[in-house]
């Protein structure tokens, strides 16, 4: 008698892999359309057509357009390598931690700057996306606050408290500054990262 259990297990794995591929194809199709046409001008039906799936499949995978964008946001930091950032933060002194954070932001903006800009602009008229953008921004601020608050007393420059340090970082390392330096001033992403690293040390640390 032949045991059919392995076959059933393989079939389950195949279905799971296919479902993951379908989700990825839908997400990539949505990103292309959102960036090219804008959030408001893109319908779920168009996303389905672009991905080569049915409309119910899109809804089953992500719920709605906001669910699609949230999934894109969750995946956006993967190319930026958050594990690398974590490792660098755990073992570095403050100047190196700032450099690690600048490097992460550079990688994030390089790979997903178009998506970040889309969400922020669409959030001006779409409440769900405004909420999403605010949540992401606050999460980033929270990480910076956690890092800065762990530094020994006297690490920050005189007159710079924790809140000011977080604000200063956000004012320097953001998608607008990155975009201007890359598109208008002709800088390379690596040069932006190096400049951020140097200016953050000058602005934040007592040296």
Predicted regions and their residues:
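Basic, helix-initiating cap at the start of DNA-binding domains
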Residues: 1-56, 60-63, 67
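Hydrophobic alpha-helical segments that form the core
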Residues: 3-4, 123-125, 141, 158-182, ...
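Amphipathic, non-transmembrane alpha-helical scaffold segments
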Residues: 19, 23, 73, 102, ...
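Residues in the recognition helix of alpha-helical DNA-binding motifs
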Residues: 61, 71, 195
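Short loop-to-helix capping motifs
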Residues: 64, 112, 125-126, 175
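Alpha-helical DNA-contacting segments of helix-turn-helix folds
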Residues: 69-76
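Hydrophobic alpha-helical connector segments
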Residues: 71, 84-111, 165-166
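Amphipathic alpha-helical packing segments from all-alpha helical-bundle domains
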Residues: 106-112, 117-120, 128-153, 163-167, ...
